[in-house]
């Protein structure tokens, strides 16, 4: 049974003819049906009882005169806009760790006035950016949507390729003839795709991120646009999959906005310097670029939100005849977290900065659209391990492993077994997963099952705890345990032969810093929160999964869940309702 904290109705943003400042926000007031609910949830005050009763009775009288103002129908109709905030590498414990230091209008606004699920965990081992975003927007795990990693071995090209690169498309927004990106590797459709189908294309769907994969998968197959940045210049780009040229507003943004973020000092609340972009800039095209310099600072998230606001304004997002969907994948947390770990002062400051930036964006949405017409969802694609050096100080086993040395060790073991005296690159290791070159094994007459088993044993000898081969997972050969199920959910039939290594606790495949991509809670635990009129405010301590996000939204929208969705509708957090408008149609 869920535990629900009491909701503080008194500070919910509203929308009417007057203007009320609430919890540091000043959005236009919400619809009058929410105002009627407040008549029965007004906080105590020092005013005389008679005066307070008069105010309440006046509100009740007002409600009785309003059409369609019954309390149970407070959220009749669809929202004009759904915003999904995906914070890259944001562990589920961060919200509780820093809750007392957050303001009232950012994270705490969503937690206090939304449905908050603090016990949300991915039920698979592929805890990386591409699989995480795919899972959030398809409602499926890798065995459904097909995305198992950020990149993998392409047997035809004989090289590693990214999850979204598409040679049939071109990049738009930068000089040259570079390959573009698309969701062509997805095996299932997304929430945005189903929204498009239900509204005959009237809904508009956008994805943005500093990373291509963080923008492309949320936008889905039918998305109107996905935008990410050119890593050198910071300019926003897209792909010919979506359009052949950038809109004029994006071109204007690129001509002036990136320059604002160079030459800036990132400081903590006491004014102490955390990082300076001034000494690392490379505006001339040489050396470190925008992604590396500005990305892993609090300015990276500010840059994304600035672009998101422009997109809402110039594309009239939330102002069409049907519900629009906007995904904002905030990449800087991941870019910084790999370097300094989750317990560093820098990560704390980024969380505090992000709290303020989210508050500003919520305020923006309130003014532009009205929060009564907006649903906001907060989650993350994965967590991260603490720095192994810090873990070891507490006598907990941990290690930094050099993935390239491990790869050489595994290839050496396979060479000794199958082609002694004739070294070959049998394996490409993307820790903890090994991709096998099928041609190399074919040259020594080794079949898939035997090749994968040999690589798995070599991985154990190199220091991994255990392994699962692609062949094993295809046959469902995994223990009937929670951990076994995680690896079955991590399987995909697509791509070349592979072996999934099971890492030891707090053991990462980088010689310094930290990483993710494990089945352990520090990687699987992420936040999940919903804000909007359909959601009963409170904290729900049931165990939930990120796959529950899209079926919950789809049910409320009256549309089909994505084709491979396996999640459940989080009914415990939903308010009752009388009737609705048509599927996906925004209320007038």
Which sequence ranges carry the predicted segments?
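Low-acidity, Ser/Thr- and Arg-rich intrinsically disordered low-complexity segments
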Residues: 2-11, 15-19, 23, 33-36, ...
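Bacterial N-terminal signal peptides
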Residues: 55-68
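Beta-strand elements within well-structured catalytic alpha/beta cores of enzymes
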Residues: 79-91, 110, 136, 195, ...
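Short, structured active-site-proximal loop/turn typified by the sulfatase FGly-forming signature C/S-X-P-X-R
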Residues: 95-144, 204-208
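Secreted, luminal/periplasmic, and some membrane-associated catalytic domains
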Residues: 102, 119, 145, 150-180, ...
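Active-site His/acidic residue clusters
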Residues: 216-225, 284-292, 296, 311-312, ...
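Long, well-ordered, tryptophan-enriched scaffold segments
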Residues: 223-307
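Substrate-binding rim/cap in mid-to-C-terminal beta-strand-loop elements of soluble/periplasmic
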Residues: 393, 401-445, 515-557, 571-580
């Amino acid at each position: 049974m869920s535990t629900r904290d009491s909701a503080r109705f008194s500070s919910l943003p509203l929308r009417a003819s007057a203007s009320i400042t609430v919890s540091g926000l000043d959005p236009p007031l919400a619809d009058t049906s929410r105002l009627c609910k407040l008549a029965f949830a007004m906080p105590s005050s020092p005013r005389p009882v008679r005066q307070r009763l008069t105010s309440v009775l006046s509100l009740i009288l007002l409600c009785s005169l309003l059409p369609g103002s019954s309390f149970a129908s407070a959220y009749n109709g669809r929202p004009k806009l759904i915003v999904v905030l995906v914070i890259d590498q944001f562990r589920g414990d961060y919200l509780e760790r820093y809750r007392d230091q957050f303001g009232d209008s950012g994270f705490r606004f969503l937690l206090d006035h939304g449905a908050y699920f603090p016990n949300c965990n991915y039920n698979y081992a592929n805890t990386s950016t591409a699989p995480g975003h795919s899972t959030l927007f398809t409602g499926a795990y890798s065995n459904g949507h097909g995305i198992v990693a950020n990149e993998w071995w392409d047997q035809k090209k004989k090289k590693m390729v990214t999850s979204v690169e598409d040679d049939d498309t071109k990049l738009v927004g930068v000089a040259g003839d570079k390959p573009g990106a698309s969701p062509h590797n997805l095996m299932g459709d997304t929430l945005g795709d189903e929204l498009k189908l239900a509204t005959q294309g009237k809904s508009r769907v956008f994805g943005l991120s500093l990373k291509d994969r963080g923008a492309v998968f949320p936008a889905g197959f039918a998305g109107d646009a996905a935008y990410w940045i050119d890593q050198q210049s910071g300019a926003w780009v897209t792909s010919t999959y979506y359009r052949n040229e950038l809109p004029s507003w994006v071109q204007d943004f690129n001509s002036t906005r990136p320059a604002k973020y160079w030459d800036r000092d990132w400081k903590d609340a006491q004014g102490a310097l955390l990082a300076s972009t001034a000494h690392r800039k490379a505006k001339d095209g040489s050396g470190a670029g925008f992604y590396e310099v500005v990305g892993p600072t609090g300015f990276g998230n500010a840059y994304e939100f600035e672009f998101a606001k422009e997109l809402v304004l110039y594309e009239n997002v939330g102002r069409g005849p049907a519900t629009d969907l906007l995904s904002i994948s905030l990449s800087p947390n991941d870019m910084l977290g790999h370097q300094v770990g989750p317990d560093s002062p820098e990560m704390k400051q980024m969380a505090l900065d992000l709290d303020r930036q989210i508050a500003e964006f919520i305020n923006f949405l309130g003014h532009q659209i009205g929060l009564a017409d907006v649903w906001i969802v907060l989650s993350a694609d994965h967590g991260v391990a603490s720095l192994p050096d810090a873990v070891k100080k507490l006598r907990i086993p941990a290690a930094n492993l050099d993935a390239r040395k491990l790869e050489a060790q595994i290839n050496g073991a396979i060479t000794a077994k199958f082609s002694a005296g004739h070294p070959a690159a049998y394996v490409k290791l993307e820790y903890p997963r090994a991709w096998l070159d099928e041609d190399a094994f074919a040259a020594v007459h080794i079949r898939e099952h035997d090749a994968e088993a040999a690589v798995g044993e070599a991985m154990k000898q190199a220091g991994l705890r255990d392994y699962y081969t692609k062949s094993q997972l295809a046959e469902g050969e995994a223990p009937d345990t929670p951990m076994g199920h995680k690896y079955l959910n991590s399987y995909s039939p697509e791509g070349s032969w592979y072996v999934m290594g099971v890492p030891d606790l707090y053991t990462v495949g980088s010689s310094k810093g930290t990483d993710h991509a494990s089945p352990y809670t520090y990687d699987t635990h992420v936040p999940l929160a919903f804000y909007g009129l359909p959601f009963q405010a409170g904290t729900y301590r049931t165990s939930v999964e990120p796959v529950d996000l899209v079926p919950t939204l789809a049910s409320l929208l009256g549309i089909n869940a994505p084709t491979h969705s396996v999640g459940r509708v989080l009914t415990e957090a939903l308010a009752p309702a009388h009737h609705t408008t048509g599927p996906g149609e925004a209320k007038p």
